[in-house]
């Protein structure tokens, strides 16, 4: 296990212990960076990328067991989030200069095929998609950070929202059964992370600008952040909340963006 050193950070981000199968570092090859990670069936999956700008970015979904690694699929653009559903299919949020997309990836003996599922909302291009979460009932939740331009990627969109505080972030839900898209909650000042409770009944949403995590009934629709039936599960956070992760025992992990050291809370 690796224990974070006791270093005071100007951001005040919470420090905690980290471990990964008794290894401190999982090598992923010559990629420029990693956007997001998940663990599934004993493997670690990471969205690794090359390309300094969004126009040139190519992202691979890389799988590793701590020893060898392999890229199982590739997309053009920024792979901002991914989640496994109950059937083992992958759901992805992908951002390109043309806008965002919710995609589904399926695997067979020929490899992985990625299809775009949602690219527009009410006729307008999907914005800066930032996160995705799959529920046990098959429904797929995805977040749009805000109404900012997507030309420079998710990071730039979130920074703009942090300064402008427009509160134009939304969380949507896609139902594969009838291919419908519904709005879950709006008014988020930088929707940057999603998590579902182990039973799939409660949805958690990171609000970057308000430095809090909202919670609501996963079946709720057309809510407003901070309004009726949408309460703050964690407020006054010492950092800017980003990705969320839920353990089987109900423990919620919150990552902070732009901290001097990227510890989890």
PLM regions and their residue ranges:
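Short loop/turn segments that connect beta-strands within beta-propeller blades
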Residues: 64-68, 106-110, 174-179, 217-221
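Beta-propeller domains
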Residues: 45-70
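Short, conserved, GDST-rich strand-edge loop motifs in beta-rich repeat architectures
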Residues: 48-56, 142-166, 257-265
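A short loop-to-beta-strand structural motif that recurs across blades of beta-propeller domains
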Residues: 58-62, 101-104, 169-172, 212-214
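Asp-box/WD-like beta-propeller blade repeats and closely related beta-sheet repeat scaffolds
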Residues: 95-136, 143-150, 154-159
């Amino acid at each position: 296990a690796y224990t974070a050193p006791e270093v005071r950070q100007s951001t005040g981000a919470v420090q905690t212990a980290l471990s990964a199968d008794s290894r401190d570092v999982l090598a992923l090859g010559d990629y420029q960076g990693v956007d997001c990670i998940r663990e599934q069936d004993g493997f670690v999956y990471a969205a690794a990328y090359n390309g300094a700008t969004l126009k040139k970015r190519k992202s691979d979904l890389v799988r590793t067991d701590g020893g060898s690694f392999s890229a199982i699929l590739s997309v053009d653009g920024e792979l901002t989030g991914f989640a496994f559903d109950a059937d083992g299919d992958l759901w992805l949020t992908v951002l390109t200069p043309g806008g965002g997309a919710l995609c589904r990836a399926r695997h067979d003996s020929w490899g992985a095929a990625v299809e775009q599922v949602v690219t527009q909302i009410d006729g307008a291009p999907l914005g800066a998609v930032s996160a995705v979460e799959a529920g046990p009932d098959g429904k797929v939740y995805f977040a749009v950070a805000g109404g900012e331009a997507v030309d420079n990627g998710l990071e730039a969109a979130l920074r703009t929202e942090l300064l402008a505080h427009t509160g134009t972030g939304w969380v949507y839900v896609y139902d594969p059964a009838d291919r419908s898209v519904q709005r879950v909650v709006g008014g988020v000042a930088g929707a940057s992370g999603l998590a579902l409770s182990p039973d799939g009944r409660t949805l958690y949403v990171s609000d970057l600008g308000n430095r809090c995590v909202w919670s609501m009934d996963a079946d709720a629709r057309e809510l407003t952040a901070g309004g009726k039936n949408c309460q703050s599960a964690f407020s006054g956070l010492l950092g800017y909340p980003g990705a969320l992760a839920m353990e089987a025992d109900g423990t919620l992990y919150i990552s902070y963006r732009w901290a001097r050291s990227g510890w989890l809370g």
